[in-house]
């Protein structure tokens, strides 16, 4: 199995269990998330609850929670939204932090494509949810989530150059 970690922080952000499609000249990866239910596991331990003290099943939480698979699997943490000015400031900082960690070939690809990717992302800012890895570092790679027109499941966008492939 391959896990993709944040190149800047080491937080796990994605795995090969979630297929991706390259967009914006390979600068962004597009991944489809799915809503799933979590919780409400019925366990039959063979005991006769009516014969034991306590009556009701005490201490059993059978609540059901709807979660998005990618957010839940990688414990992504939602962040406040960005306005255009804040997003541009983040992108400038991100480029400055990420570029030295890339090979010269990757740096060239990233520099060529980041402007187009930024122009692709800017009009969608109001529609995005922003996530970072579990560590919630200030310098984290942002993962963007939004709903395509008519979709019931979210689509996630990752900066491809900000991910490091790790074999597990």
Curated annotation (Swiss-Prot):
In terms of PANTHER family, this protein maps to: GENOME ASSEMBLY, CHROMOSOME: A01, TRANSLATIONALLY CONTROLLED TUMOR PROTEIN-RELATED
Localisation:
Cytoplasm
Organism, by scientific name, is Brassica oleracea (Wild cabbage)
Gene Ontology CC annotations of this record = cytoplasm
The UniProt entry, under Pfam families, shows:
TCTP (PF00838)
Name of the molecule in the record: Translationally-controlled tumor protein homolog
Q: Which GO terms describe its molecular function?
A: calcium ion binding
Q: Which InterPro entries match?
A: Mss4-like_sf, Mss4/transl-control_tumour, TCTP, Translation_control_tumour_CS, Translational_control_tumour_p
What is the name of the gene encoding this protein? TCTP
Q: What does this protein do?
A: Involved in calcium binding and microtubule stabilization.
Indicate the principal place this protein occupies in or around the cell.
cytoplasm
Source organism, top-level taxon: Eukaryota
Q: Which UniProt keywords apply?
A: Calcium, Cytoplasm
Family as reported in the entry's similarity comment: Belongs to the TCTP family.
Q: Which residues form the TCTP domain?
A: 1-168
């Amino acid at each position: 199995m391959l896990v993709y970690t944040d190149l800047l922080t080491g937080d796990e952000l994605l795995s090969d269990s979630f297929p991706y499609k390259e967009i914006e000249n390979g600068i962004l990866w597009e991944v489809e998330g799915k809503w799933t239910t979590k919780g409400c596991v019925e366990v039959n331990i063979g005991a006769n609850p009516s014969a034991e003290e306590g009556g009701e099943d005490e201490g059993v939480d059978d609540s059901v929670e709807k979660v998005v698979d990618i957010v839940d699997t990688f414990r992504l943490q939602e962040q406040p939204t960005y306005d255009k000015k804040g997003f541009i400031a983040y992108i400038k900082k991100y480029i400055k932090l990420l570029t030295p960690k890339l090979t010269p070939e990757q740096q060239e690809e990233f520099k060529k494509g980041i402007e187009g990717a930024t122009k692709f992302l800017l009009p969608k800012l109001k529609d995005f949810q922003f996530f970072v890895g579990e560590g919630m570092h200030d310098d984290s790679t942002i993962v963007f989530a939004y709903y395509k027109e008519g979709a019931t499941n979210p689509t996630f966008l990752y900066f491809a150059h900000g991910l490091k492939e790790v074999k597990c």
